[in-house]
């Protein structure tokens, strides 16, 4: 019932998106894509799906400031160009180190791209469906076959070292996670 209210009566998620030009983002992804697509696929259709879809496309293709929940996806240009988000080169990162959380963002963006692609297909937008489906494999660029874990990479593509998959981080490589949690 609440899901229906957010799409129809309150229109809050789309209305909030119209204010800033992007669907609201949460944590590191823009899971409005899963919410809107899931609602549509469940038969909730009496909302302005086209407006919601256009905002989801902004999230997927337009660089946002990433400042707050109205800023769109951060690092989307880098994600689109190289297929993944690189991590900052930080010497001796600590648990609370603040960086790009690049592994987590890449994984979440790939998931959000999949959700938006499903909506594109439902709406007959085959061009964006194809583009987004290609990006759903982006997370694979951060799987290190030598360690068998999801792992951060630097801008030049080298793996971050040293690497301990048990070591958690607040926002370095992962968001409140470690290699084990991000892989399995």
Protein language model features and the residues they cover:
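Short, small-residue-biased leader/transition segments that mark boundaries at the very start
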Residues: 3-8
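Carbohydrate-binding/catalytic loop surfaces
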Residues: 18-37, 73-101, 151-176
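Long, hydrophobic, well-ordered secondary-structure blocks that form the structural core
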Residues: 9-13
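Mature extracytoplasmic enzyme cores
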Residues: 40-106, 119
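Active-site-proximal structural scaffolding
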Residues: 17, 28-33, 45, 49, ...
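Catalytic cores of carbohydrate-active enzymes
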Residues: 14-15, 117, 121-184
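Well-ordered alpha-helical scaffold segments within catalytic/enzyme domains
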Residues: 35-45, 112-125
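Active-site-adjacent helix/loop patches that line small-molecule binding or acyl-intermediate pockets
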Residues: 33-37, 56-60, 136
């Amino acid at each position: 019932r609440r899901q229906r209210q957010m799409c129809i009566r309150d229109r809050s998620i789309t209305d909030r998106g119209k204010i800033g030009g992007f669907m609201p983002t949460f944590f590191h992804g823009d899971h409005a894509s899963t919410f809107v697509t899931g609602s549509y696929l469940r038969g909730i259709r009496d909302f302005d799906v086209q407006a919601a879809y256009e905002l989801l496309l902004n999230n997927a293709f337009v660089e946002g400031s990433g400042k707050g929940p109205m800023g769109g996806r951060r690092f989307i240009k880098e994600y689109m160009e190289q297929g993944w988000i690189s991590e900052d080169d930080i010497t001796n990162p600590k648990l609370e180190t603040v960086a790009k959380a690049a592994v987590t963002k890449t994984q979440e963006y790939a998931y959000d791209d999949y959700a938006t692609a499903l909506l594109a297909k439902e709406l007959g937008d085959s061009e964006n469906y194809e583009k987004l489906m290609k990006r759903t494999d982006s997370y694979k660029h951060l799987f290190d076959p030598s360690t068998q874990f999801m792992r951060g990479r630097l801008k030049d593509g080298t793996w971050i070292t040293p690497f301990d998959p048990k070591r958690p981080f607040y926002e370095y490589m992962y968001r409140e996670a470690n290699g084990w949690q991000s892989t399995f």
